[in-house]
A protein has these predicted regions:
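Glycan-processing catalytic domains of CAZymes
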Residues: 1-174
């Protein structure tokens, strides 16, 4: 964790990340350069946990960064793909933006169930003063990574799948 924080500090200085005028192409949130900490709170026995994530988030915030946190789909209820530790919610509240993982969780037909989840997630985020960035995706296929014989895919449906997610997130207040 210390090495990561040292690296981001050096990168920020080298590339003037904290000076929007010198680095206008970098992404900023509320006037601060944005850094994402991804994969926090999953219950799949990762080699890091909430303690390490908190150390990194606290360090990034103290260095003047805005932080987006990438979390599991079921983060709010602390079930399913998410570890059951309520400290995850405390950690989310320390961040500026929340982005749950949804890739592969639904297709165009099953999306309405998840749209309701997104609506409730946005309500929680607003109540807890955390911005919410909905993760939307155009479709998915394992074909490029696992070969053509692998037939697990989520069709793009000529863009209608992506648009359904975008419109659902906007209507929910994202």
């Amino acid at each position: 964790e210390k090495l990561l924080l040292k690296d981001i500090d050096e990168i920020a200085k080298r590339y003037s990340l904290k000076d929007h005028a010198k680095n206008p192409s970098y992404l900023y949130h509320n006037g601060k350069p944005l850094v994402t900490v991804w994969g926090v709170g999953f219950n799949d026995n990762r080699s890091y946990g909430l303690n390490e994530a908190e150390y990194i988030i606290d360090g990034l915030k103290s260095q003047g960064f805005s932080v987006m946190l990438g979390v599991p789909t079921q983060w709010r209820k602390l079930e399913g793909d998410t570890e059951s530790d309520p400290r995850l919610h405390e950690l989310i509240r320390k961040c500026d933006i929340l982005m749950p993982w949804f890739v592969g969780r639904y297709n165009e037909t099953t999306y309405p169930k998840y749209q309701k989840l997104v609506e409730e997630d946005i309500q929680w985020a607003k109540k807890n003063l955390v911005d919410y960035a909905p993760l939307v995706y155009p479709g998915f296929s394992w074909g490029n990574m696992k070969g053509k014989e692998h037939n697990s895919f989520i069709p793009r449906n000529k863009g209608s799948f992506l648009w359904k997610q975008l419109m659902g997130a906007i209507r929910a207040g994202a």
